[in-house]
Regions:
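Extended lipid/amphipathic-ligand handling interfaces
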Residues: 212-214, 218, 243-253
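Membrane-embedded beta-strand positions in outer-membrane beta-barrel channels/transporters
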Residues: 4, 40, 245, 389-391, ...
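Structured extracytoplasmic
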Residues: 24-195, 201-209, 270-379
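Periplasmic N-terminal soluble interaction domains immediately after the signal peptide in Gram-negative
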Residues: 1-32, 243, 263-269, 275-276
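Outer-membrane beta-barrel channels and translocator barrels
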Residues: 251-253, 397-399, 428
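Outer-membrane beta-barrel translocator/channel fold
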Residues: 238-240, 265-279, 424-428
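Transmembrane beta-strand segments that form the barrel wall of outer-membrane beta-barrel proteins
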Residues: 200, 227-232, 369-380, 390-391, ...
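Transmembrane beta-strands of outer-membrane beta-barrel proteins
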Residues: 258, 402-406, 428
C-alpha cells in the first residue's frame, strides 16, 4: 500500500529529517541490557529543579495563545441547517492538531503576562496581565477563563503529573521503569545540542499513562524536549485525549527553566467513539526575558484585581506585532479573520445574542438596563405555589463599580406581592 505523509507548510523548514518507525520492540533479558535504562539512570541522578527556586527573586515574560475549536467535523456536520448562510466558515477548518482531525476554530485568545516572584523570606508570586486580545465576540471573559483553567503547568521531573486532578506517572520520574518501556531510537541535534531520542510507552495499556519520546542531552543528560500523549484507553470523564510538548532551557547541570509548552486537550460529552464530535482546546505558552535577583519593589507582588476584559489591557495591532514572542500561524490569523466576517452576518449576530442571554440570564432592554434573571421568571414552592417574577438591573460593563437591581414577584397560592431593591458598590 502507498504511504501518504502530510506536512504542515508552516513547519516544514524546522524539519531536518523524517524517521518512520514501526511497532517492533526489541526484547531484553533485563532492563540493565537496555541502553535506554543507562541513559535514564543518568537523568535520575541529575534530576533538575526549576531554576526559579534557586534565586531570591525572579521575573519573566509569558506569551500565551489559547484556541478552542469544534473537532472531528465532517461533511454531514457542515450541511446542518444551522449553518445555512454561514457555510464560508468551513473554509477556515484545518487539521493542524496532533491527531490530524478536521477542526473548526471558533475562539482565539492572546495574553501577555509579567510574573514577579520572591522565594525569601516566604514564597510569593504575582502574575500581572500586560495585554489581552480576544477573537472578536462581545463577551469572551467567561470562555477565556474557563479555557485557561483547563491547563496546568507540569514539571516533567516529578514522579506524578496532574491533569484534571488525576495523577499520571511521569516518563521522567525515578520510578518510570515500573510503568513504562523505554527504547533508544535515534540521535538528533536540537538547537545545536546533540540529544538521544528515547521512545517510551506503557507496559500495561489499561493504566492511565502516556506514550511519546524524550530528547536528552548527550553531554549533561538534561531533558531538552518532552512529548507526552495519552493512550487510546484514557479513562477520564469527558476527556478523549491529552497531548503535551515541553521544551526546556538548561542554565547549567543542576537547574532548568521552562522555555515553551504546547498542550492539546480533546473533550466531549458525546462519548469517546473515534468519530464523535468534540471540543479541542489548544494552548501555547512561551517564557522569555528571565531576570533574577533584581530586588524589585513589593508593589509588584500586590494583587492588581485584574480581569481579562479590563479596557487598559486592549492594545493596538502594532503592539502585538512587537510583543508576540512567536508569530501567529496562518490558522491563528484566520480565526480573527473568520470572526470579522461572521460579525457582518445578521444570523450570526442573532445566534451570539441568544448565547449571551442564555449565558447571563439577562435580556438587554435599552441602553444600560437589563431584564432578568430569565431563569427566575417562573417558580414553584410549597408556600407560594406557582410564582412569577420580573426583575431588572443596571449593567454598563462587566467591571461596573456600582450596580442597582430590583424585582417584583407574585405567588398564586399565598396571593402575596413581593418586591426588593438592592444596590452594590465595589470599593476596590
Amino acid at each position: 500500500e502507498n504511504l501518504a505523509v502530510k506536512l504542515h507548510p508552516e513547519k516544514v523548514e524546522q524539519i531536518s529529517e523524517v524517521v518512520i518507525s514501526g511497532v517492533t520492540r526489541k526484547k531484553y533479558k533485563n532492563k540493565k541490557e537496555n541502553p535506554a535504562y543507562a541513559i535514564m539512570q543518568e537523568v535520575w541522578k541529575r534530576r533538575k529543579t526549576n531554576g526559579l527556586a534557586n534565586y531570591n527573586d525572579y521575573q519573566f515574560k509569558e506569551y500565551e495563545k489559547i484556541e478552542i475549536g469544534l473537532n472531528n467535523i465532517d461533511s454531514a456536520f457542515m450541511k446542518k441547517k444551522i449553518f445555512s448562510n454561514l457555510e464560508f466558515i468551513f473554509d477556515y477548518a484545518d487539521s493542524a492538531n496532533f491527531d490530524k482531525k478536521l477542526a473548526l476554530p471558533v475562539f482565539f485568545n492572546e495574553t501577555i503576562y509579567k510574573t514577579y516572584g520572591k522565594n525569601h523570606p516566604e514564597k510569593k508570586e504575582n502574575r500581572i496581565i500586560v495585554a489581552n486580545k480576544f477573537s472578536g465576540f462581545n463577551d469572551n471573559e467567561l470562555i477565556a477563563s474557563t479555557a485557561k483553567n483547563q491547563f496546568k503547568e507540569v514539571n516533567i521531573y516529578d514522579n506524578t503529573l496532574n491533569f484534571f486532578n488525576i495523577g499520571f506517572p511521569s516518563p521522567a520520574g525515578t520510578d518510570g521503569f515500573n510503568t513504562y518501556e523505554y527504547e533508544l531510537t535515534d540521535s538528533v541535534s536540537v538547537d545545536g545540542i546533540e540529544a538521544f531520542v528515547i521512545k517510551y510507552f506503557p507496559r500495561n495499556k489499561e493504566i492511565l499513562a502516556f506514550q511519546g519520546n524524550l530528547l536528552i542531552s548527550k553531554d549533561t543528560y538534561n531533558i531538552v524536549k518532552a512529548a507526552l500523549r495519552s493512550t487510546n484507553k484514557i479513562n477520564v470523564n469527558f476527556v478523549n485525549g491529552i497531548y503535551l510538548e515541553n521544551e526546556y532551557e538548561n542554565l547549567d547541570d543542576n537547574i532548568f527553566l521552562p522555555k515553551r509548552t504546547y498542550t492539546e486537550l480533546e473533550m466531549s460529552v458525546l462519548g469517546k467513539k473515534k468519530d464523535a464530535k468534540s471540543i479541542l482546546f489548544k494552548r501555547t505558552g512561551i517564557f522569555s526575558e528571565y531576570e533574577f535577583n533584581k530586588n524589585f519593589s513589593e508593589n509588584f507582588l500586590a494583587d492588581k484585581g485584574q480581569t481579562l476584559s479590563d479596557d487598559n489591557l486592549k492594545k493596538a495591532d502594532d503592539f502585538w506585532e512587537r510583543q508576540r514572542t512567536e508569530p501567529l500561524s496562518e490558522t491563528e490569523q484566520n480565526v480573527y479573520k473568520m470572526v470579522g466576517e461572521l460579525e457582518q452576518v445578521p444570523k450570526f449576530k442573532r445566534i451570539v445574542k441568544l448565547v449571551e442571554i442564555l449565558e447571563s440570564g439577562y435580556i438587554n432592554a435599552w441602553n444600560s438596563i437589563d431584564f432578568g434573571d430569565i431563569y427566575s421568571v417562573y417558580g414553584n414552592n410549597e408556600v407560594e405555589g406557582d410564582r412569577i417574577r420580573a426583575g431588572a438591573r443596571t449593567y454598563f460593563s462587566p467591571n461596573d463599580m456600582w450596580r442597582i437591581a430590583g424585582y417584583t414577584a407574585y405567588g398564586f397560592k399565598d396571593q402575596k406581592l413581593k418586591y426588593g431593591l438592592e444596590g452594590r458598590y465595589m470599593f476596590n
